[in-house]
């Protein structure tokens, strides 16, 4: 029998932010009714645990070491109906030995059916293009995965030693060329994810959240952060950049106490990797493909608290401003003596933005602008410091990236699935002037979730409270869209 905290169930039922769904024999699956300001449910258990983690970092210990031998479970990841084009490349096949597993002993629910592969477009074979897949996945780090927060999941299925096998199997199964991960603990990156994925032909970069700088070496091991992995046969790392929002807030706080008191204390980060596409990744190859083509990949984990929607939006604006600086510098290095051309560097932005599709964060990223009077700013008096930060004196804040979201609500109704919150907070954005989505991974079967009364994740078959996103993109060579510029450096 699974233990469900009655107090939490009552809180969810009585919360104006939720309503229960009593279908399927009164399973009581919480269904989100959004507030006018479209913020996340304040009872989102994962976010409550993050807050406790900030307050109780000192008390970390490895969980479940005292338990008897856990049941081994051979994770069976779903196989897409249609495979992405890039999967037909043998370099995408994992060469690493799978982690050992045994038949399940306590699993009473069949695994979910395959997540469908949804074709969107055919590649344009008349121009050089690099076809690649990208995954975005919040893996739910060990520190946050407690019985107090996820009482509907068996203890053994919450244990990291069990979940990490399913997570790495899922990552390997989809074999994305670029992998964007959030909530990766420092020790787990260096001692698990990096060595495992290096065996599969990946290189990776990582940074923990900013608080790690103030901690001892022992405590630092358990701070989570963001990671980017890329297939070494397709990409080369040119430069990596860490974006620390608390440092940016402190440097731009003049004239706004709220920038110091609300934004600066939050230690979320963004991590960017400037990659060069290798020549053999282009099809068809031509003289144009001998010209170096940079791609900027960024992963971010934005602040969680729904009461701080202003912080979420400001962190996202800071992120876009820093990415613009990186792109401008990269464009200048590839085109010396010429005016910066941001189109020379394509942008891929992935992450857990903890923001719903109709939030200020997603409006800013997707539309390229947001009003200074947007409700998410909460009239906190950020106008002057944001104008100074973004060099903007108009009535709206803008960016010039021309981004599009790979997923929408019709395709993926939820990327985060817990007992008291189900919604979209994870995104993959791409430069729509330089990339075309060819296909994407569809959602987990809603029928399977309903018929098996899966009220939330993690679950013995689903290792995180987030579902991974996977998109196949066709990257067009910028030199094929226009005459090659004079002076473009060939950095082969």
Model-predicted regions and their roles:
Residues 2-46, 55-121, 265, 277-285, ...:
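Metal-dependent phosphoester-hydrolase catalytic domains
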Residues 105-131, 172, 178-304, 308, ...:
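Structured beta-strand-rich core segments of catalytic domains in phosphoester-bond hydrolases
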Residues 109, 154-177, 188-194, 199-200, ...:
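Divalent metal-dependent phosphoesterase catalytic cores across multiple superfamilies
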Residues 134-135, 349:
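Residue-level marker for buried hydrophobic side chains located in beta-strands
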Residues 139, 184, 302, 352-353, ...:
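Active-site metal-binding loops of divalent metal-dependent hydrolases
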Residues 140-161, 246, 250-258, 262-263:
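Acidic/histidine-rich helix-loop elements
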Residues 162, 166-167, 183, 188, ...:
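Acidic, Ser/Thr-rich intrinsically disordered and amphipathic helical segments
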């Amino acid at each position: 029998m699974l233990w469900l905290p009655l107090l939490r169930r009552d809180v969810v039922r009585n919360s104006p932010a939720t309503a229960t769904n009593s279908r399927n024999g009164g399973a009581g699956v919480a269904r989100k009714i959004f507030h006018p300001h479209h913020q996340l449910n304040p009872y989102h258990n994962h976010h409550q645990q993050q807050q406790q983690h900030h307050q109780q970092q000192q008390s970390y210990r490895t969980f479940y070491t005292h338990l008897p031998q856990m049941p081994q479970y051979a994770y069976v990841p779903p196989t897409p109906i249609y495979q992405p084009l890039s999967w037909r490349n043998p370099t995408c096949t994992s060469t690493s030995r799978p982690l050992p597993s045994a038949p399940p002993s306590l699993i009473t629910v069949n695994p979910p059916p395959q997540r469908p592969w949804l074709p969107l477009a055919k590649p344009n074979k008349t121009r050089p293009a690099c076809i690649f897949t990208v995954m975005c996945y919040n893996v739910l780090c060990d520190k946050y995965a407690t019985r107090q927060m996820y009482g509907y999941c068996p203890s053994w299925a919450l244990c990291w030693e069990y979940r990490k096998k399913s997570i790495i199997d899922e990552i390997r199964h989809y074999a994305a060329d670029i992998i964007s991960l959030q909530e990766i603990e420092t020790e787990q990156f260096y001692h698990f994810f990096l060595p495992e994925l290096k065996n599969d032909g990946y290189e990776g970069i990582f940074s923990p959240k900013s608080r790690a700088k103030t901690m001892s070496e022992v405590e630092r091991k358990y701070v989570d952060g963001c990671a980017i992995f890329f297939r070494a046969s397709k990409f080369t790392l040119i430069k990596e950049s860490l974006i620390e929002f608390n440092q940016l807030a402190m440097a731009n706080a003049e004239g706004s106490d709220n920038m110091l008191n609300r934004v600066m204390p939050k230690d979320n980060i963004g991590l960017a990797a400037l990659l060069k596409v290798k020549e053999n990744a282009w099809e068809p190859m031509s003289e144009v493909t001998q010209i170096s083509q940079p791609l900027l990949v960024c992963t971010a984990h934005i602040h969680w608290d729904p009461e701080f929607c202003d912080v979420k939006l400001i962190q996202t604006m800071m992120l876009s401003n820093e990415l613009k600086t990186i792109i401008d510098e990269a464009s200048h290095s590839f085109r010396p003596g010429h005016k910066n051309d941001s189109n020379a560097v394509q942008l891929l932005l992935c992450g857990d933005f903890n923001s719903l599709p109709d939030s200020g964060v997603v409006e800013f990223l997707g539309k390229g602008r947001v009003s200074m009077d947007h409700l998410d700013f909460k009239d906190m008096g950020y106008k002057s410091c944001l104008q100074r930060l973004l060099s903007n004196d108009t009535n709206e804040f803008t960016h010039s990236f021309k981004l599009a979201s790979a997923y929408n609500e019709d395709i993926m109704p939820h990327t985060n699935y817990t007992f008291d919150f189900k919604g979209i907070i994870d995104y993959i954005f791409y430069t729509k002037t330089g990339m075309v989505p060819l296909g994407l991974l569809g959602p987990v079967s809603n029928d399977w979730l309903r018929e098996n009364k899966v009220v939330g994740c993690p679950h013995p078959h689903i290792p995180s409270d987030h579902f991974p996103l996977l998109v196949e993109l066709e990257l067009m060579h910028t030199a094929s869209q226009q005459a090659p510029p004079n002076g473009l450096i060939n950095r082969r």
